[in-house]
Design a protein with these regions (language model features):
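Extracellular adhesion/carbohydrate-binding repeat motifs centered on closely spaced tryptophans
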Residues: 1-467
Length: 467
């Protein structure tokens, strides 16, 4: 801390010129003062030139010491001159706590009086220009000692483990004392109620223009959003704005390093309270938060030209899923990891695929080949409209699709009958509908005939005659 402490002090040798029996008199190298009656002056100030000097109870001029006079405190330097408009670091001869430093700071104003607390019962800050030209605010106790660390509304220092909870202002260390305002501070905190494994015995705090810590509020600072708890610590990790939060409750995430509400894309481990199963997996997942910090959940959302889906906990979906969707809201969500997970005819879910391109998790449209239980399948997903991303149901590009999967014959079948919309179609190993076929033969030597739509008109072990 830069504290102005250089004083231009006149020495007695230059300011006291010569003294008669009345006035200043040096005896045994100690200065005394005698009034016009010849009486020695004690416990009083006397002026010489532009400077004031203190005569103690023995009539000796005081040097290098703190002087108490009429409930005010002054300091005289090594020449006995009253110090004015200066900081002084003095021995702490009356420590109140074991953790107090050996020295304390005082500031002496233009009248030489040490700044000290008023009797109003509220903290009183003094504005002082430091040696570096910066203007800062400081507070002092009733004896003029500069306060530091956490203090409350009354200007009392808070020194226990709960100081960060009971304190309202923060004034830095013992050699600092400047009130924090418009400023962040990362401060040590003992919090036995904190169960998050990320907690490292400190919190971020923000101090407003009036020096008071932000508490129990959401605040935008330099374009970033933060949520401050009851005692002013900026929240970190996962949290919801309601004590009885459910998966439907808006949730937020703030990294511990800076504690701002994440906005846009971020990657982290799911929260222990917001997503217990995901937390147990311990795998980092992608999330997306709106401008207000609210994490997108149970929704398909367009982001930077691509569509993404998020489950009920806000995790970005990656892979093949069956979803029940209503106006971009996801009502149900199940990952398809095996053929047993595929939706059945009549199910309300539709199949979507997220990934498979340069943007991880982006909704896939058009055709793609996917592996399910070691088998390769061709899927086709709608490219536009309200059903964008859904797997096709029906005939598209000369093939039949069911929940996006192309229906086709196995290689060892060559041809296969497919039931669709009340009709029986014939498809090959590429899923192509076989139209206008005459006696097409499958791997079992069974013959088929189809019409112009590919609907089977004949099936048998014998060729159909040309009659």
């Amino acid at each position: 801390m830069l504290i102005p402490c250089a004083a231009a002090a006149l020495t007695l040798g230059s300011s006291m010129m010569a003294f008669a029996a009345t006035g200043w008199l040096q005896e045994d190298e100690i200065w005394h003062y005698y009034d016009r009656n010849g009486d020695e002056v004690t416990s009083s100030w006397k002026k010489s030139g532009n400077d004031w000097f203190w005569l103690d109870e023995d009539g000796e001029m005081a040097v290098s010491q703190l002087v108490e006079d009429n409930d005010n405190y002054y300091y005289v330097d090594e020449s006995g001159v009253m110090v004015r408009n200066q900081w002084r670091e003095l021995e702490n001869d009356d420590p109140q706590d074991d953790d107090e430093p050996d020295t304390v700071w005082y500031y002496f104003g233009a009248d030489g009086k040490a700044y000290k607390a008023k009797d109003s019962g509220r903290v009183n800050f003094k504005t002082i220009v430091r040696a570096d030209g910066a203007t800062k605010k400081y507070a002092f106790d009733e004896e003029g000692k500069m306060l530091y660390g956490w203090i409350d509304e009354q200007g009392e220092r808070q020194t226990g483990d709960d100081a960060w909870q009971t304190g309202l202002y923060y004034l830095g260390g013992p050699d600092d004392g400047a009130m924090r305002s418009h400023q962040w501070e990362r401060l040590d905190a003992v919090d036995d109620d904190q169960t998050n494994d990320e907690f490292q015995d400190w919190y971020w705090f923000y101090f407003n223009a009036n020096g008071k810590k932000a508490a129990d509020t959401k605040k935008t600072i330099n374009g970033r959003k933060y949520y401050f708890e009851e005692y002013g610590n900026a929240r970190f990790s996962w949290y919801a704005t309601s004590s009885n939060a459910s998966v439907a409750t808006p949730s937020f995430y703030s990294p511990i390093q800076d504690s701002w509400m994440s906005v846009g894309w971020f990657k982290t481990v799911p929260g222990e309270n917001t997503d217990p199963a995901g937390y147990s997996d311990g795998e980092e997942r992608w999330y997306y938060a709106e401008k207000d910090g609210d994490v997108v959940k149970s929704r398909i959302k367009k982001i930077n030209g691509s569509y993404y889906a998020f489950d009920e906990y806000g995790k970005m979906l990656e892979g093949l899923y069956k979803l029940e969707v209503s106006d971009k809201d996801i009502l149900s969500c199940t990952e398809i990891e095996s053929e047993n997970d595929l939706p059945e005819d009549g199910d309300t879910e539709e199949v979507y695929y997220f990934g498979g391109n340069s943007k991880a998790g982006a909704m896939k449209t058009g055709t793609t080949t996917l592996d399910i239980d070691g088998e390769r399948y061709t899927y086709n997903f709608r490219k536009s409209g309200d059903e964008r991303g859904q797997g096709y149901n029906g005939i598209e590009d000369g093939a039949i699709y069911e929940k996006g999967k192309r229906l086709e014959a196995d290689k060892d079948e060559k041809l296969k009958k497919v039931e669709w919309d009340g009709e029986t179609y014939l498809v090959n190993t590429s899923g192509k509908i076989q139209k206008n076929k005459k006696n097409a033969k499958d791997a079992d030597d069974r013959y088929y005939c189809t019409d112009s739509k590919g609907i089977v008109t004949y099936e048998g072990m014998e060729k159909k005659s040309e009659k």
